[in-house]
Each structure stands twice: as structure tokens, then as C-alpha cells.
């Protein structure tokens, strides 16, 4: 029994050290195959993530490092092995992929522990359209919207500090620090540009976001703790909370007196590096939360974050944009008639609801950049597609409209959708006319004036809408929960809106 206990202690002690795994030949193959079988990562075009990974070259590199007995020889050949600007690109790729595989498997093992199992406050959905019903249900009862963009350019030392909170191997963390500071291109968190995406950058981005959201959960737990203390109402709030602050030590040295409020709610939504928090609170406390996030980036992540980058809006007076939609609140008045014995009285009931619209002016500008129309919205021919066959031209326009219609199916103003349909329909006709060196009338005669509406998508969409709206006549919009990716035009629109908000500030 004593021998078994000693062996267990040795195994636990060995699990803390990750540095020797870099020199294990079989670990890379096993870990890489395990990750492929478990996650089934989709291919991303024009990215460094899907380049071929040669394990033969990896073994050669491991053998070379093992043979270097002298430290001076290692220092001489350091730039050849670790420098990304070196002619042989594969050395840096081997180090990057090896670190990513080790870190991924290490955190997968840690995720099964009880510490991470407690992190159940967040719901992660695959469909993007699940965000919009959540906004309609919960943001209606909020007063203010706080939105900002998560900075992606951070110092490598911050990433090392985040990883050191879970990694106990000092030599491995020193190796990470050495590689990150030597090659800053390896630790770029701009994973949304396809040219710079790597497996290591994806892992670092997720660990960075996890640290951010985990801290927010802990802060909101403290708020619920203060709400549960009933004796705080009769006592002085300022002195009582400052006493609790000295007992409960937090990572940020900020006064918690503005946290206490009876009716307080927070709703958090994030996509990529853009997040929105809906706050149900007074104007004073909402401004305090804006200041809190400013100090949060400054003291917790050591990032010089400008206060102007955090936008705070009142929902009742301003609209807010998210994922290509523009949301706002409108009041509807309902007249209720009540018959009494001698009189007939009318009662006006006002009800608030969130409406979602598509910004047609911004969409027309994006369609003009893609050469589907001009800046005024007049359709033009797509000259780059004139070399394709007629069926390929039909399929491309049909696919663009199909994705656009499904994504913006929950908007209130359907006229904007029909305007986009008009632009794509006439652009398709002009492209065919330019290809055959004829006029639009010839295209109408050959394919019919409603050729764009005769596709399989429109027939299927008409059948679904007729059956659905007959069963539910009061519903005027549909959210499709099988949409997994954001529309390309909506993504460009979101970036454009963020740029205009920065210029206005």
C-alpha cells in the first residue's frame, strides 16, 4: 500500500510538468489524432491552420535539440529554431503547433475537474439566431446598454500570467515567455483575419476570453451576495459595504458601494470580440459600471483602455446594433373597451416591445462595394461573373439571396428585404444580358420576368410561410435556429457600424 501511495504521488508530481512533453515523439501524433477525431475542425480557406503538419520533420527537430548538449551551441542556433523570420518556416511552425497541442490537451484534462464544472452560468449556443430571441425577451426590461470591443492587441506577458494561474511548471512557462517575446507574431489574437489565424492564437484567444468572463461571473455573484443580506437596508450602505470589502479581498481595488441595489439585472451577449451588457439600473449606477469596466481593463489586464471606447446608451431613446441588426424599443397602445351596465368605458394600455430592422442604406453601400448596384441603389451587372454559365450565375445570385433572406427573416420591415431582392434580381438580369450581348427584354422573354422567383428556394419558402402563418397568424417574423454562421454582408455591416460609432465619439 505504501508503494502504491508513493507511485500515485510521483504520477501527480509528473503531471505538473509539461516541459518534457515537448521532447516526446509519440505525444504529438497521439494528441493530433485525438484532436481531429474529437473536434472535427472545419477547414478555413486561406489560413495557416490547415497547412500540412509533417511529423517526420518534427522528429528531426526533437533529435537536433537532444543532441545539443552545450548551452552555447543552443544559443548560437536559437534564431534558426525559434525565429519566425528564418528561411525555414517549418521550425517555427513545429514549435507553435507543439505548444498548442500540449496546452489544448492539458486544459482538456483540467476541464473535467470540479473547479471548472462550477462554471455553469453561461449558455453556449451553436445557432446565431438564438441570440436575437434572448435580446427580445431580456433586454426589454433593461434601462441601459453598455457595449464595447474587446482589445485583441495585448502584451505577451499578460497571456503568460493567465496561463501561469493553471500551469505549475515553471520551466514550461519560462519557455512560453521566451518564445512569445521573441516571436510576437505567434501570439497575435487577431483571429478574425484569416491570414493570421493559427491553432495557438485560437487557444490563446479562448483562454483570454475565459478569464474575462470568469471574472465577470465572480463579480456578479458578489452582487447577488449583497442583495441577499437583508440587514443592509436599515444600516448605512457605504460603511457596511466598505467593511465587507476589507474582509473579502478582490483583485481590483475599487469601491463596491455602487454595486448595492435592490432591483439589479445584467444580461451579457458576446460574438467574437464585440459584447453587449444590458443593465437594469439608474443612470448614476450605469455610469459607475462604465467606469468599472474602464478600471477593469486597466488594473486586471494592464491595458490602457480609453473611456471613450465604452458606449453607454439609454434603450428607450437610442437604438443599438448587433450582428447586422438594429434594435430599438417602441411603445404600442391598445384600446380595451369595457361594457358596464349604463356606460361604455375605454382603457388605453401601453406596451413596450423590441423591434429589429435592417439598415437598408448601409446594406446598399455594401452591395455597391460588391458591384451589385451603384451608391444610389440602382442595379448594375456583375462583370466578373459573365464568364460563368447561366446556371452558375443563377445559383450564385440565388445563394446570396437565400442566405440574406434566412438571416434577416426576423426583421420588422420586410420592404427592405424586397428592395435587396429587387437589386439582386435586376443585377442578375443585367449580368445575363451583358454575357449574351443583348438587352434585359431578351432575358425576360427567354427566362420569364419572374425568373428569379422560380427557383427551388422561393417555392420552398412560400410553402413554409403559408403553412406557418396559417397556424400562427399573429407572428410576423421567424428565427431560423439552424443558422450557424453570420451572413457575410451582416458581418461587414457590423464592422462598418463600429467604425462609425468610433468616429462619432
Swiss-Prot record:
Transmembrane regions: none
Record-linked InterPro entries: Domain_X, Maturase_MatK, Maturase_MatK_N
Q: Which GO cellular component term is one of those annotated?
A: chloroplast
Biological process annotations from GO: mRNA processing; RNA splicing; tRNA processing
Molecular function in Gene Ontology: RNA binding
Identify the main location: plastid
Identify the keywords attached in UniProt to this record, alphabetized: Chloroplast, mRNA processing, Plastid, RNA-binding, tRNA processing
**Annotated localization:** Plastid, Chloroplast
Query: What's the family?
Result: Belongs to the intron maturase 2 family. MatK subfamily.
Q: Its biological function? A: Usually encoded in the trnK tRNA gene intron. Probably assists in splicing its own and other chloroplast group II introns.
Q: What is this protein called?
A: Maturase K
Question: What organism is this sequence from?
Answer: Physcomitrium patens (Spreading-leaved earth moss)
Q: Which gene encodes it?
A: matK
Amino acid at each position: 500500500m505504501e508503494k502504491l501511495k508513493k507511485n500515485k504521488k510521483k504520477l501527480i508530481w509528473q503531471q505538473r510538468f509539461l516541459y518534457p512533453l515537448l521532447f516526446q515523439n509519440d505525444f504529438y501524433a497521439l494528441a493530433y489524432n485525438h484532436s481531429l477525431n474529437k473536434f472535427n475542425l472545419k477547414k478555413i480557406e486561406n489560413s495557416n491552420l490547415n497547412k500540412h503538419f509533417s511529423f517526420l520533420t518534427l522528429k528531426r527537430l526533437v533529435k537536433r535539440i537532444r543532441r545539443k548538449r552545450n548551452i552555447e551551441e543552443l544559443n548560437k542556433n536559437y534564431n534558426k529554431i525559434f525565429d519566425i523570420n528564418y528561411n525555414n518556416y517549418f521550425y517555427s511552425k513545429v514549435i507553435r503547433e507543439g505548444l498548442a497541442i500540449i496546452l489544448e490537451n492539458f486544459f482538456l484534462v483540467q476541464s473535467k475537474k470540479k473547479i471548472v464544472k462550477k462554471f455553469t452560468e453561461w449558455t453556449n449556443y451553436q445557432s446565431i439566431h438564438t441570440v436575437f430571441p434572448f435580446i427580445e425577451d431580456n433586454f426589454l426590461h433593461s434601462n441601459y446598454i453598455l457595449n464595447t470591443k474587446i482589445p485583441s492587441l495585448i502584451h505577451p506577458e499578460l497571456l503568460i500570467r493567465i496561463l501561469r494561474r493553471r500551469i505549475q511548471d515553471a520551466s514550461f512557462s519560462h519557455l512560453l515567455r521566451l518564445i512569445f517575446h521573441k516571436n510576437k507574431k505567434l501570439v497575435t489574437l487577431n483571429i478574425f483575419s484569416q491570414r493570421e489565424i493559427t491553432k495557438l492564437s485560437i487557444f490563446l484567444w479562448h483562454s483570454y476570453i475565459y478569464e474575462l468572463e470568469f471574472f465577470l461571473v465572480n463579480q456578479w455573484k458578489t452582487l447577488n451576495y449583497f442583495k441577499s443580506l437583508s440587514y443592509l437596508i436599515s444600516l448605512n450602505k457605504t460603511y457596511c459595504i466598505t467593511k465587507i470589502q476589507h474582509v473579502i479581498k478582490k483583485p481590483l481595488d475599487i469601491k463596491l458601494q455602487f454595486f448595492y441595489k435592490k432591483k439589479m439585472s445584467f444580461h451579457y451577449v458576446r460574438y467574437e470580440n464585440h459584447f453587449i451588457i444590458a443593465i437594469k439600473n439608474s443612470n448614476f449606477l450605469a455610469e459607475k459600471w462604465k467606469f468599472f469596466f474602464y478600471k477593469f481593463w486597466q488594473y486586471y489586464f494592464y491595458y490602457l483602455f480609453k473611456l471613450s471606447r465604452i458606449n453607454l446608451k439609454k434603450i428607450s431613446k437610442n437604438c443599438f446594433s448587433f450582428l447586422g441588426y438594429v434594435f430599438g424599443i417602441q411603445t404600442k397602445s391598445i384600446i380595451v373597451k369595457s361594457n358596464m351596465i349604463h356606460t361604455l368605458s375605454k382603457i388605453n394600455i401601453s406596451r413596450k416591445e423590441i423591434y429589429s430592422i435592417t439598415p437598408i442604406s448601409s446594406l446598399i453601400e455594401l452591395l455597391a462595394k460588391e458591384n451589385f448596384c451603384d451608391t444610389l441603389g440602382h442595379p448594375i451587372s456583375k462583370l466578373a461573373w459573365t464568364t460563368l454559365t447561366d446556371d452558375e450565375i443563377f445559383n450564385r445570385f440565388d445563394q446570396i439571396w437565400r442566405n440574406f433572406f434566412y438571416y434577416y427573416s426576423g426583421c420588422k420591415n420586410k420592404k427592405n428585404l424586397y428592395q435587396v431582392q429587387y437589386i439582386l434580381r435586376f443585377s442578375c438580369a443585367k449580368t445575363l444580358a451583358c454575357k449574351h450581348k443583348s438587352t434585359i427584354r431578351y432575358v425576360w422573354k427567354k427566362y420569364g420576368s419572374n425568373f428569379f422567383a422560380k427557383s427551388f428556394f422561393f417555392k420552398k419558402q412560400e410553402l413554409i410561410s403559408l403553412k406557418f402563418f396559417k397556424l400562427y397568424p399573429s407572428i410576423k417574423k421567424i428565427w431560423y435556429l439552424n443558422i450557424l454562421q453570420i451572413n457575410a454582408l451582416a458581418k461587414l455591416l457590423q464592422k462598418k457600424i463600429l467604425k462609425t460609432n468610433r468616429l462619432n465619439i
